[in-house]
Amino acid sequence: MVSLGGLARKVFGSSNDRRVKSTRPRVEAINAMENEMRALSDTELAGRTEKFRQDIANGASLDDLLVPAFATAREAARRVLGMRPFDVQLIGGMVLHNGGIAEMRTGEGKTLVATLPVYLNALAGKGVHVVTVNDYLATRDSEWMGRVYKFLGLSVGVIVHGLSDEERRVAYASDVTYATNNELGFDYLRDNMKYERAQMVQRGHNYAIVDEVDSILVDEARTPLIISGPLEDRSEMYNTIDTFIIQLQPQDYEIDEKQKTSIFTEEGTEKLENLLRDADLLKGESLYDVENVAIVHHVNNALKAHRLFQKDKDYIVRNGEIVIIDEFTGRMMPGRRYSEGLHQALEAKEHVAIQPENQTLASVTFQNYFRLYKKLSGMTGTALTEAEEFGNIYGLEVTEIPTNLPVIRKDEDDEVYRTVEEKYKAIVKEIREASAKGQPTLVGTTSIEKSEQLADRLRKEGFKDFEVLNARHHEREAAIVAQAGKPGAITIATNMAGRGTDIKLGGNAEMRIADELGDMPEGPEREAREKEIIADVERLKEKALAAGGLYVLATERHESRRIDNQLRGRSGRQGDPGRSKFFLSLQDDLMRIFGSERMDGMLQKLGLKEDEAIIHPWINKALEKAQKKVEARNFDIRKNLLKYDDVSNDQRKVVFEQRIELMDGEGLSETIAEMREGVIDEIVAKAIPENAYAEQWDVAGLKAEVAEFLNLDLPVEDWAKEEGIAEDDIRERITQAADAAAKERAERFGPEVMNYVERSVVLQTLDHLWREHIVNLDHLRSVVGFRGYAQRDPLQEYKGEAFELFQAMLGNLRQAVTAQLMRVELVRQAAEAPPPEAPDMFGTHIDGTTGENDFEGGETALLVRQEQNAVVAPEDRDPNNQATWGKVGRNEACPCGSGKKYKHCHGAFA
């Protein structure tokens, strides 16, 4: 029976169909220009860029230029790459230009699609960012598609890990910049820790196209980018508490796998209190007394570490370190650490060295970073299941782009077995049958542990020729994925490992040529070998096609339908045949957590025998329902987190904008004077209550605070004794004395140095207080949830108290800046004052596809100081040119040749 909605769609078409249909007139207009474009010489075609820029200068909008610009970019791609964008790719390009998400199936050429809106938007000269999930793809695409942009006269840059600030500035200044989401986010944070505008590398957030947009804006939305600095060592505390958790019995705690929460029962709490008391760690009578907040935090983390986190599923131990496993991709994420002390609890559990906790210096979520862009768009193979989230959070509409050729892949119903053992028997049998007839098989698993269990089983069953693609073997990832389409190939992969590399039937000719002929010089012999490889790949492709194309065999359902769809989507690219099937058991995580008991009873009643499967569309529907529930819950979590993060994000934007204004400002004397007046108002109001008699004034307190904040010794006692003296008189006299002292200091320093000193003091003080404020907000957020028990809305409470904390921070800023500037002295005026140094920083910087930290050594490494602080060898320093000195140690001989230590010569600035 057709639903009313289905009937309406048949008559009127869906909103998606209408959006696609609305682009057709422009597609036809672009096609109508094709012969005209082909008739142009290379010089004439490239010259159109300058003409378009002139049109924009004369008032034309980018929409006005869409048809001719797309026609130009299409012809350039045909000439330079030998690739002509199809009509459906033009539609995808228009969706991206309009600030939407284009859902395009695997193999439909998303990389090429992006060139069309990138070219059009780059004409405005404000920069376009193409965002990918790892350095490999950013570099590959910038070189590959960069040929089109360069042919058309545009500059292209790429941001990858390890570049200097100068190289980053050049890349960001390009018309088109390819970069990873992590590099963009960290450059934004680092820019907002700089002390001079010229040191910043980014030039604004105009337009971004995010590749694999679901991975970046949904899967990674909850994981903030964090720059942090080290805190005190608490390893002994973690180890002690870990020994207590081991002593607990199942009745001492309750675990909820579905919600991923754990709590202590009354018996457990009592047992813990006794253990903590014996270890002299408990203050007061109860574990939940206010002075034991930190201890509660530690014991909760230790319980989670032991009961909610499994080794080889959620993390592995490698080289004496806990390495997190990405739940979506099954990849290792070296360098990424759980926050709030959970990682340290896992280290204590596994008896490896406990790394110190870090204090957050700056952080931003991808949700908030990408909302900085004036226009944002994205592409992926799977976005429709998250359409509501993209719409609600980012204001992005998802449009499903039709495929160039119809998808003929056969998606078969799930096979459900009672036990994991029965399921694996069926999987091995299925793999054997597919391999025997020469059908390439991609076997999808949800974790490293399961991929290796299956690999062991295949070995025992006599399989020799198969590949395992999981976090342990990421180095060969692209190569394994590229050859997974060979006839009879068996590839076991965790979830979406290798995303970004197509599985081509017969194998990937380009990668084979690079691999087999890497060192062979150009010439007739190499050309002959290349032709042989291409012919061999074609032959193998025909064989794989005859066997039915790629068979995607999934061993488990993921919590998210989108991840399942991504796995299915590896098969049936560009009209190729293929098939997909999920093999499940009632002992799988999703089935177990979401009510498999009822189904088990039902299957027993139906008389299901051992090794028999149940296959029915109803089962698929029931599973989809369970997945929708999980997705809805995860969306609610992300939405709720965003509401809280928006509070700190609004404050972050205010602070970062203020920093830029301070760096841009020629003179800050007026701002400093206002701060000073604010401090004077506060200390006078505190000492002299409204309508109070002179005898009631706190004269001693006022004198002490004038000395503390203004560095002035004023006869406040004598003033207070004067007949008829009022509060305003006291305030005016203090202000006059403070202004006179500030003016005298400014004249001694000179305007240039004074401006530098003021800017440095304000920026450094603001940064220090902002870091403390971030910690305070984190603490507030961790406790505000309990207000719900008092029938108060935790979010409103958080907003109110966060605002109060922010106001208090600004008050502290006024006081600290005033106190410092009223004391600062010039020991020796440097010829060129060195910029302040940033604090020691650690960056958690994870590649979204490989799940690895891009810092060298695979560890969370000390962030490299900016290039103006780089160490320069003494022999390379010119005594007469300070720009060549780099970073000089304070106790080194001054490079100017005076013979004094640097700190007593050019570095003598306090």
From Swiss-Prot:
Entry keywords, A to Z: ATP-binding, Cell inner membrane, Cell membrane, Cytoplasm, Membrane, Metal-binding, Nucleotide-binding, Protein transport, Translocase, Translocation, Transport, Zinc
Alphabetical list of Gene3D superfamilies matching this protein: Helical scaffold and wing domains of SecA (1.10.3060.10), P-loop containing nucleotide triphosphate hydrolases (3.40.50.300), SecA, preprotein cross-linking domain (3.90.1440.10)
A single cellular component GO annotation: plasma membrane
Superkingdom to which the source organism belongs: Bacteria
Cofactor(s) for this UniProt protein: Zn(2+)
Protein EC: 7.4.2.8
Binding site residues for ATP: 89, 107-111, 502
GO molecular function, one term: ATP binding
One Pfam entry name: SecA_SW
Top EC group: translocase
Compartment(s) of residence: Cell inner membrane; Cytoplasm
Cofactor note: May bind 1 zinc ion per subunit.
Chain residues that bind Zn(2+): 894, 896, 905-906
Catalyzed reactions: ATP + H2O + cellular proteinSide 1 = ADP + phosphate + cellular proteinSide 2
Residue stretches in coiled coil: none
Signal peptide extent: none
Membrane topology: Peripheral membrane protein
UniProt xrefs under InterPro entries: Helicase_ATP-bd, Helicase_C-like, P-loop_NTPase, SEC_C_motif, SecA, SecA_CS, SecA_DEAD, SecA_motor_DEAD
GO BP of this protein: intracellular protein transmembrane transport; protein import; protein targeting; protein transport by the Sec complex
Subunit field text: Monomer and homodimer. Part of the essential Sec protein translocation apparatus which comprises SecA, SecYEG and auxiliary proteins SecDF-YajC and YidC.
Membership in a protein family: Belongs to the SecA family.
Function: Part of the Sec protein translocase complex. Interacts with the SecYEG preprotein conducting channel. Has a central role in coupling the hydrolysis of ATP to the transfer of proteins into and across the cell membrane, serving both as a receptor for the preprotein-SecB complex and as an ATP-driven molecular motor driving the stepwise translocation of polypeptide chains across the membrane.
NCBIfam families recorded: PRK12904.1, secA
This protein's name: Protein translocase subunit SecA
Species name: Mesorhizobium japonicum (strain LMG 29417 / CECT 9101 / MAFF 303099) (Mesorhizobium loti (strain MAFF 303099))
